[in-house]
Amino acid sequence: IGDHGLERGLRFKKLTDTVRKERVAVIGSGPSGLSSAYQLARRGYPVTIFEAFDKPGGMLRYGIPSYRLPDEVLDGEIKNILDLGVELRCNMRVGADISFEELRKKYNAVYVAIGAHRGAKLNVPGEDSAGVYTAADYLNRINSGAKVDLGNKVVVVGGGDSAIDAARVSLRMAHKGSGDADQFDTESAQTVLDSARVSKRLSHAQVAILYRRTRAEMPAIGHEILEAEKE
C-alpha cells in the first residue's frame, strides 16, 4: 500500500483544518514516534520530533538493510508525515542537547518513543570480546556507514530474521572487498539469518548459523531460510 501511494504521489490528509494550541514533543523518530506524530498532526496538533541521530527512521533505517526497506521508500514515507506540518529536529539528544525539563516547559505533552536499540546477549564468557556484536548493534553500524572488519569467517548465533539480515549484509560487504557500508546497497534486517546470508555471498567467506533448537523450530520466516541457503 505504501509503495502504491508513493508511486502515485498520494499524500496524507488532515482530519481537521483546526490548529490546536497544545504543542506536542515526540522523542524519537522510529516507527512509534513517526506514528504518533502522524496521528497527532492529522488532528491539528503542532508536533516537533527530536531525533538523536542525523537521519530519522530509527530501527527502520538503522536496523533494516536497504534490500528489505530501500532508503527512497523510507524517505518518501517520512516526507509525507513531515508534509503534514511536523517539525523534525535531528542530532538532538534529549539529556545532552536539550533537557527533558525544557521539553516539559515548552510543550503541553511529551511522547517518549526512544525504541529498543539494544540487542539480546547470551551472558556467556567472551561475548564482550572484539569482533563480537549483537545483531542490533552490528546492523546499526553497517547502516550508519561505519567500517567493520569481518575477517573471513562469520558465525551467527540464533535462528531469527535478524540473523539472516546480518549474514546477508556481511556477504555483500565482503564481496565488495570493503567494510564500508556506504559502498554497497545495504539490506534491511531480520536479525540472525540475514547476517548469515550476507556473509555467505563472499566466495572466500565462511558463514555458519548456530541455533539451539531444530531447523523446523527456527523463528525466521521459512522462505528467508531457503533464500539464505541458496546464497
Question: What are the roles of these predicted feature ranges?
Answer:
Residues G2-E231:
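Residues forming the flavin
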